[in-house]
């Protein structure tokens, strides 16, 4: 599962930022007033056509298109959605960036979690809170999952509507654990996981765990150790992020615990792609793996042995630590006509509705962003036969509302990840000390943020 935006795309984003923002150091939430209401669409002549861009592929794209086809059928003669699948999130952002220059941004953009800072900074979106207030017959924001709302909020104001969520899980080959005499109850903490990984390797010869060198996992290790990933306030207050925070003692300890597993030979190197971890796990080449809940279907389709999924282990109390959600969210363009904005909001409301969320979640494995479907009998029946989905939902539902679990919000995220990954690879291989790796990553990431903010300010 690819999360990162490529360096080439990140550079393209920077080139187009100048002049997009009035200030690079403070946040300015989209206006919560003046949003168009139902009359804007009702008074429009003919069919209101809107554009919808996304970066999903495979079964996820198919499930999304099925919902959009349903929306078009229900709104025939009034609204028509023209969908454009961009192939990947990197391609989506590259095309979106080009559209900024000629003011042709799509009516609705569905983009991934780490692009949120950039999409917010370019100020081409309409406030979801304003649209909900002006269109009370559509989406009820209080139905959205709190963890999703927090991730897509700045200064306590919602800036995009979550479409789908993922959460980090620990997948476990129960047969290999039994051979090694390891109880799953010992895997609730990071220290317990490390001890189990070594014990499994010693007892069975199979590596205890696989973790892809995707920076999402270092963000999770940070949040579950009770620390911020960027400052101030993870970039979510009135001031935007100006530095990373990679060197807090409990954070370094969490990183070092995972690195210790690898240096002891109890971890399997699967590179940077989480899909490689799925392949290794299904082949019995690792007893455990960290992976996104979004791979649940792939794991189910490729494994032939009993396994379970467990919540991501913590290394700090829940009073200050928790996991960070991933996924994607929908952004409504402020460059669209009032009729298009209302039509776009109706599409967003439809896709985020309980019925649509149930269909999309069950087709893809993503955690639904709408909590109103939880009491549905059909949904309860589905979860009873899909325990991994239940574990993922429970983790998202129960995550503590603390600053660490909100995640870092910055338009420089892709560059930060590019700075962090090679340093962690060096630390995990033992070619560089953890302290030096984090110092080097900090220097590079802080420079990336500085460069981004300079471009954003138009200097």
Feature map (PLM): residue ranges:
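C-terminal capping/gating helix-and-loop segments adjacent to ligand/active sites or protein-protein/ligand interfaces
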Residues: 390-444
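Short, solvent-exposed loop/beta-turn-alpha elements that line the ligand-binding surface or hinge
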Residues: 129-144, 186, 228-253, 301-302, ...
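Extracytoplasmic/periplasmic solute-binding protein
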Residues: 154-155, 159-163, 168, 191-243, ...
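Extracytoplasmic "Venus flytrap"/periplasmic binding protein-like
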Residues: 70, 74-144, 179-181, 280, ...
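Hinge/lid segment of periplasmic solute-binding proteins
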Residues: 113-168, 221-224, 309-310
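Short, low-complexity disordered leader/linker segments with a strong preference
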Residues: 1-50, 73, 446-459
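Extracytoplasmic/periplasmic substrate-recognition and gating elements
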Residues: 46, 180, 256, 260-266, ...
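Glycine-centered hinge/linker elements that transmit conformational signals in sensory
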Residues: 197, 240-270
